[in-house]
Amino acid sequence: MDSEDNSAPRGERGIEQFSHVSVLSQEAIDFLAIRRGGTYLDATLGLGGHSYEIAKRLGAQGHLIALDKDTNALEMARRRLEQVPDDLKEDWPQITLLHASFAEMKQHIASKSLDGVLADLGISSMQLQDAGRGFSFQAEGPLDMRMNPHGDLTAEQVVNHTSERELADVIYEFGEERRSRRIARAICRARPIRTTAHLAQVISVAARPMNQAERRIHPATKTFQALRIFVNHELDDLKELLASVPSRLVPRGRLVVISFHSLEDRIVKDSLRDGASAGKYELLTKKPVTATEEEIDRNPRSRSAKLRAAARK
């Protein structure tokens, strides 16, 4: 999961006011092995960092399709991708930006043959830094957590209207939090909870760190992760994406996935392994690629990143 930034002011801001560096960017580009004139899908557009690097290598005959659930991110990425250097303007590819989730990908690219697919999973620094989105436990904000601002379910609804048992199950399953029942009990007793700060305070009291290992992360980290994953159907969407990709990749087309926690990585690992066993993929990464110490020093959020890649047979 991404590291938190408690210095960020609340509210929507322009792209220049957010700090976001794409993780494992060069490694992702290398594994994609981009073909000039090819068609590529960036399944997690974000602020467009990876998409920009892909676009620079595609050429005027190429086509980049990029999608994101987050309408705010789409608009910011659009502005970034329109800032084409003069020496690349005549060689810039066609770019199609789509407001869509992984699960909706099939209906948008049903007729496309893709040379490569990139997915950089999880939450972006931009989303964490905007306290108004409700993703961070280090800033006061509404309990929202929707990646798609127009989605129906919010974290506030889950926190305040889910039974104690169901809430504990969510925290355990999607946060891998062994203190889930204690935390769920404390949340239910503290209802109504309307803000991220209030929720973080309730969790911190209920799950005080008892040893050095527990002190390494904030007590609310896993619960906030669980709520975010549940609200946004992140793991179901990831499974949909991975199931859809093989039928859309051309022979030798590449799939590259960057994950940030064990739940995501396990799904990616199992999917690629099963695809290789079924003769669909050649695994390009026997073990996940991780960030160098130099990158971790520059960008601490890269510490937990794992990249896996495969080529279509």
UniProtKB/Swiss-Prot annotation:
Keywords: Cytoplasm, Methyltransferase, rRNA processing, S-adenosyl-L-methionine, Transferase. This is Ribosomal RNA small subunit methyltransferase H. It is found in: Cytoplasm. It holds the Pfam family Methyltransf_5. Specifically methylates the N4 position of cytidine in position 1402 (C1402) of 16S rRNA. Belongs to the methyltransferase superfamily. RsmH family. One of its GO terms (molecular function) is rRNA (cytosine-N4-)-methyltransferase activity. It catalyses: cytidine(1402) in 16S rRNA + S-adenosyl-L-methionine = N(4)-methylcytidine(1402) in 16S rRNA + S-adenosyl-L-homocysteine + H(+). The lineage of its organism: Bacteria, Pseudomonadati, Acidobacteriota, Terriglobia, Terriglobales.
